[in-house]
Design a protein with these regions (language model features):
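Bacterial carbohydrate/catabolite-sensing allosteric modules
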Residues: 1-152
């Protein structure tokens, strides 16, 4: 709620920040341009394969299921086998995730919790005329399917 100024998309910023904290080298491995569409996912997936054909990352985390559908399509076109050659995890757990090939592992974001938090924040902003920005955390859970299965 409210305006924020970040040097890049907040998810990309958070990903880079956590990678740095965990000592992961992600230089040249973050593809974060364009809309969250299947077509853009195909473009980003194709670009990743072209850029890293000789040394693919172990896995990719895709910001939204429609993008991930395109990434899976690009990998199939480029003969990159998921999950053998690269694992794919997405975010939102939309209905389409269970119908892709392979079925897409995706983080489910509690829509009920998100809606409740949004309504409470809106009510607070309206009654208190609050203009201070606020961040919140919403519960997620991984719905593991064929594109990525956590190891025990």
């Amino acid at each position: 709620m409210g305006e924020h100024e970040y040097p890049e998309d907040v998810r990309t910023f958070a990903f880079r920040n956590w990678a740095l904290r965990l000592g992961l080298d992600v230089k040249g491995l973050v593809y974060a341009d364009g809309p969250f569409t299947v077509e853009n996912g195909r473009l980003q997936g194709r670009q990743l394969v072209q850029d890293h054909a000789d040394d693919l990352p172990d896995a990719v985390i895709v910001a939204a299921d429609p993008l991930a559908v395109g990434v899976l399509q690009a990998f199939a076109t480029e003969n990159v086998m998921v999950p053998r050659d690269i694992k794919v995890i997405s975010i939102n757990n939309q209905e389409i995730a269970k119908y892709t090939s392979p079925a897409l592992s995706s983080y489910d974001i509690s829509q009920d919790e998100l809606a409740k938090a949004a309504v409470l924040m809106l009510a607070e902003a309206l009654t208190a005329n609050r203009k201070i920005s606020q961040h919140m955390r919403i519960s997620t859970s991984l719905v593991a399917r064929d594109s990525f299965t956590p190891q025990d």
